[in-house]
């Protein structure tokens, strides 16, 4: 986050990370984004 804030002053990009070891036996990873209002 600190690195992003040094270069990007507004509209910071979203970031997602998963710890694979915390998903024992998982075969699928799902990420979703919800938007409310006009784009």
Curated annotation (Swiss-Prot):
Entry's Gene Ontology BP terms: negative regulation of translation; regulation of cell growth
Enzyme class, UniProt record, top EC level: hydrolase
Chain coiled-coil ranges: none
Tissue-specificity statement: Mainly expressed in the liver and kidney. Lower expression found in intestine, gizzard, glandular stomach, heart, brain and spleen.
Entry's EC annotation: 3.1.-.-
CDD domains (UniProt xref): YjgF_YER057c_UK114_family
Keywords in alphabetical order: Cytoplasm, Endonuclease, Hydrolase, Nuclease
Post-translational modification: The N-terminus may be blocked.
Presence of the UniProt keyword Cytoplasm in the record: yes
Keyword Nucleus: no
Location relative to the cell: Cytoplasm
Cellular component per GO, a single term: cytoplasm
GO MF term list: endonuclease activity
Quaternary organization: Monomer.
Function text: Endoribonuclease responsible for the inhibition of the translation by cleaving mRNA. Inhibits cell-free protein synthesis. Cleaves phosphodiester bonds only in single-stranded RNA.
Similarity-based family: Belongs to the RutC family.
Name of the protein: Ribonuclease UK114
């Amino acid at each position: 986050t600190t690195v992003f804030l040094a270069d990007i002053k507004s509209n910071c990009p979203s970031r997602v990370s998963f710890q694979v070891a915390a998903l024992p036996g998982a075969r699928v990873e799902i990420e979703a984004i919800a938007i409310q209002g006009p784009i």
